[in-house]
Curated annotation (Swiss-Prot):
Chain span(s) of sequence motif 'KMSKS' region: 337-341
Gene3D superfamilies xref list: HUPs, Isoleucyl-tRNA Synthetase, Domain 1, Methionyl-tRNA synthetase, Zn-domain, Nucleic acid-binding proteins
Protein's gene: metG
Protein name: Methionine--tRNA ligase
Cofactors named for this entry: Zn(2+)
Assembly with partners or alone: Homodimer.
Purpose: Is required not only for elongation of protein synthesis but also for the initiation of all mRNA translation through initiator tRNA(fMet) aminoacylation.
HAMAP family: Met_tRNA_synth_type1
Keyword tRNA-binding attached: yes
Protein's UniProt keywords contain Protein biosynthesis: yes
Organism: Vibrio parahaemolyticus serotype O3:K6 (strain RIMD 2210633)
Cellular-component GO terms for this entry: cytosol
Length: 688
């Protein structure tokens, strides 16, 4: 027991939630994890522990790159907008992050590179040529999640190329049955490419020991044992250009796979927090011999990455491992998978438009335990439970006593506390409730609290202050009865403070005192409270109906946008940009097209679209300005061959003379491609 961190005088904890992907909105499924973690974090703070609670957006990968292209903006612009939306949603639910960052940050780039280079130095990185699925229409290698097909194990259809949502199996996309490109719908072809691998099997003995440490949930430990029995495989940590992410140090057109730098995002976000504050030391929390505690809250769909790859990467690069990984199940609504058509796929922002976030915090807490069970948000039960527990049992306890204290005793509680034994029974429950909060058995903690609320209301019912108030000479008895009721309410709200922080804050204003775990040891006597105001409103079923309807409208709008995008895919380039009127051959022959080699390319200061080129056209050098800055970095173009209009009249521009035109194709923005001749063409050759 002496080594149990729960019994240390004061603890230092670093707590994380899984990083939401930066290409979509937060929904009520996400909120389960963030509410669960926030309750645990708030409980730890309430007990005097030091907690740093961090998160970030997972901002890399092909899905983000492609979606940004569809939107006609840069990936950086897209992830910035999504981050703002995510943080607003989490703030709306009172998720008390100390820092919210992005994996697309300098801190994360430096840490990812450092960890990779340490792993490489220590012999845990190797490379080999692999055959990989390639989209022949889009001319790009396909990431795992952009290949869909039939699971090779359970034969479920429409599964992603890295793992099966149905059976949880992980596999290579080349193992999928009947694979299709999720980008174009084309059947992928095999193409060779050099990839880099993390040697996970070297860490098997360490991972087995970590699994047997006794801290992991039994379901997680059992699942890991299955993976050990089936054999650990080397992990492909690289992806080919084009890709939105971090380039691998020392390699060209090779990028870190998003799942390598995503968990490092925990470190990056904490590093960012350390840079903002003078009282935090990054090494104290991440050194191999750290005495602090590290906990990850995640969903069951990403256990493989967090229980195998992540601790192995940390071990191999000289960092500490997590104390535990807390895994939760999925959210269902009304007993079924969340459905956009039924309006039960509810965005966090849509919920906040219609309902109090404290209601969902309470309901999730009432149904959460330490196991990996799915949680059903039954909307009828949700309404009944919140109204019955929070409004009728707990808040009503204050309202039915506060009026008498305000009207008859000028807001002052009795000097004498009439029911010390009853009060001590409520206070004695603190240890049991604390154990349940610590163990993430929130549902059991809520049952303990509501059972106490029943006892408190029973006391008030039996004493009937509304009757005593009518009897002469019983003012002291009335004051004492109501003071007991309000003090019992104070204890209950202290226990509920991690679950319902906004209600707790209103309670503190009403009681004119902060709610603290230690403070409830003694009741309030002779204490002045403020005039009672409504602390909490019951759920109106009409608001739930409005939320469902709004979710249906959101889904319909998304579907319309998706159909429009799909229609755009089938639209031909000719239909978008019809062929111009015919011209005579002699007219065309007047245009002198020449092969040119790009000698140098540089950005033009204060020009948003232009790149400045020096072109070799075979014995002559031309200066040309071209508006393709949005599609290319200057260093990518130097040394390439291209095609230019050589006899175009020179044009004087603000930034200099342009002596021709480089030919490029595409709709604009990042979708522009310069024309490149086949090998063998030489600068100065005429294009016929």
């Amino acid at each position: 027991m002496a080594n149990d961190p729960r019994h240390l005088p004061s603890r230092k904890l670093l707590v994380t939630c899984a990083l939401p992907y930066a290409n979509g909105s937060i929904h009520l499924g996400h909120m389960l994890e963030h509410i669960q973690a926030d309750i645990w974090v708030r409980y730890q703070r309430l007990r005097g522990n030091t907690v740093n609670f961090i998160c970030a957006d997972d901002a890399h990968g092909t899905p983000i790159m492609l979606k940004a292209q569809q939107m006609g903006i840069t990936p950086e612009e897209m992830i910035a907008a999504v981050s703002e939306e995510h943080q607003k949603d989490f703030a709306g639910f009172d998720i008390s992050f100390d820092n919210y960052h992005s994996t697309h940050s300098e801190e994360n780039r430096e840490l990812a590179s450092h960890i990779y280079l340490e792993l490489k130095k220590n012999g845990f990185i190797s490379s080999r040529t692999i055959s990989q699925l390639f989209d022949p229409e889009k001319e790009m290698f396909l990431p795992d999640r952009f290949v869909k097909g039939t699971c090779p194990k359970c034969k479920s259809e429409d599964q992603y190329g890295d793992n099966c949502d149905n059976c949880g199996e992980t596999y290579s996309p080349t193992e999928l049955i009947n694979p299709k490109s999720a980008v174009s719908g084309a059947t992928p072809v095999m193409k060779d490419s050099e990839h880099f691998f993390f040697d996970l099997p070297q860490f098997e003995s360490m991972l087995k020991e970590w699994t047997r440490s006794g801290s992991l949930q039994s379901e997680t430990a059992n699942k890991m044992q299955e993976w050990f029995e089936s054999g650990l495989q080397q992990w492909d940590i690289s992806r080919d250009a084009p890709y939105f992410g971090f380039e691998i140090p020392g390699e060209k057109d090779k990028f870190f796979y998003v799942w390598l730098d995503a968990p490092i995002g925990y470190m990056g976000s904490f590093k960012n927090l350390c840079n903002k504050r003078d009282d935090l030391d990054f090494d104290e929390y991440w050194n191999k011999d750290s005495k602090t505690e590290l906990y990850h809250f995640i969903g069951k769909d990403i256990v493989y990455f967090h229980s195998l790859f992540w601790p192995a990467m940390l071990e191999g690069s000289g960092f500490r491992k997590p104390n535990n990984v807390f895994v939760h199940g999925y959210v269902t609504v009304n007993g079924a998978k969340m459905s956009k058509s039924k309006g039960t796929f509810v965005k966090a922002s849509t919920y906040l438009d219609h309902l109090d976030p404290e209601c969902l915090r309470y309901y999730y807490a009432a149904k959460l335990n330490s196991r990996i069970d799915d949680l059903d948000l039954n909307l009828e039960d949700f309404t009944q439970r919140v109204n019955a527990d929070v409004v009728n049992k707990i808040v009503n306890l204050a309202s039915r006593n506060a009026g008498f204290i305000a009207k008859r005793f000028e807001g002052k509680l009795s000097d004498n506390f009439a029911e010390p034994e009853l009060y001590n029974e409520f206070v004695a429950a603190a240890d049991r409730i604390a154990e349940l909060f610590e163990a993430r058995e929130f549902g059991r903690a809520i049952r303990e609290i509501t059972a106490l609320a029943d006892k408190a209301n029973q006391y008030v019912d039996e004493k009937a202050p509304w009757v005593v108030a009518k009897e002469e000479g019983k003012d002291q008895e009335l004051q004492e009865i109501c003071s007991v009721g309000i003090n019992l309410f104070r204890v209950l709200m202290t226990y509920l403070k991690p679950v319902m922080p906004a209600l707790a804050a209103r309670t503190e204003a009403f009681l004119n005192q902060e709610l603290t775990w230690e403070g409830i040891a003694q009741p309030l006597t002779g204490h002045e409270i403020t005039k009672f105001k409504a602390l909490f409103n019951r759920i109106d079923p009409k608001n739930i109906e409005a939320m469902i309807e709004a979710s249906k409208e959101d889904a319909a709008a998304e579907m319309a946008a998706k159909e429009k995008a799909e229609a755009a895919k089938t639209e031909t380039e000719l239909s978008k940009d019809p062929i111009a009127d015919e011209i005579e051959f002699d007219t065309f022959a007047q245009v002198d097209l020449r092969i040119a080699r790009i000698i140098s390319c540089e950005e033009v200061p204060k020009a948003n679209k232009l790149l400045k080129f020096q072109l070799d056209i075979g014995g002559e050098t031309r200066q040309v300005f071209s508006g393709i800055k949005s599609a290319y970095k200057p260093e990518e173009l130097e040394g390439k061959l291209t095609v230019m209009v050589a006899n175009l009249k020179p044009r004087k521009m603000k930034f200099g003379m342009s002596e021709g035109m480089i030919l490029a194709a595409g709709p604009g923005g990042s979708d522009l491609w310069i024309l490149e001749p086949h090998e063998g063409a030489q600068p100065g050759m005429r294009v016929m």
